[in-house]
Amino acid sequence: MSLELSKFSVINRQGQNLFTPVDFVIAKGVVACVMGPSGVGKSTLLNAIGGHLSSDFRIAGKLVLNAQEVTHMRVAERHIGILFQDPLLFPHLTVGDNLAFGLKAKVGDTKQRRLLVEQALDQAQLTDFYHRHPQTLSGGQQSRVALMRALLAQPQALLLDEPFSKLDLDLRHTMREFLFDQARLRLIPVLLATHEPADADAANGPLVILKPALSPAQ
């Protein structure tokens, strides 16, 4: 599995590039980082890759996932997961039911789905948390649940939009290592948007620096 961007940029309604077009490849199991000044378009880049781009923008360039061009595919067809700053768990559902949302509809019967969720909880060191509710969990525990939910969907690539920004330093380190280990174990290409050099150092992968453009698209 690999994720490849060629002359990739995002263009606004005025026909301007938000950032200088980028070219890079993320191999399977590799964590790449994208950095740049605040407001340059890191989150917009991730939304464009994941298929969540606002209608105020359009894509220029090519996006290839596992040798298949997905530039203009619908979200569901891309099989690209994304994690945000906030875990975005459903407060009215148990932890187990939150995780089950990540499973594809055709995956197993009720018993098999329950087993997959419990295995995910074990991997996240959250055994016996199935019937807990999100509001009873710490920030780090909620982040782990959100990650495992994304992984249960079996994404072919994973996008991370500053998922550690609200965690303290110790928890940030722990969660970062857990997330990177899970991605490498599953051989998923990962792109992390961050403003922290320590994240890029820990990722030890390609570093993409977004540069403001706001020039007419070619």
Language-model regions: role of each:
Residues 68-84, 105:
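ABC ATPase NBD coupling module
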Residues 93-102:
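Short coil-to-helix segment of the ABC ATPase nucleotide-binding domain corresponding to the Q-loop/switch region
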Residues 111-129, 180-181:
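Conserved ABC ATPase "signature" region
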Residues 133-137, 141:
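Conserved ABC ATPase signature
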Residues 147:
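Hydrophobic anchor residue at the start of the ABC signature
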Residues 152-156:
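A short, proline-enriched helix->beta-strand linker immediately N-terminal to the Walker B motif
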Residues 158-162:
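Catalytic Walker B motif of ABC-type/P-loop ATPase nucleotide-binding domains
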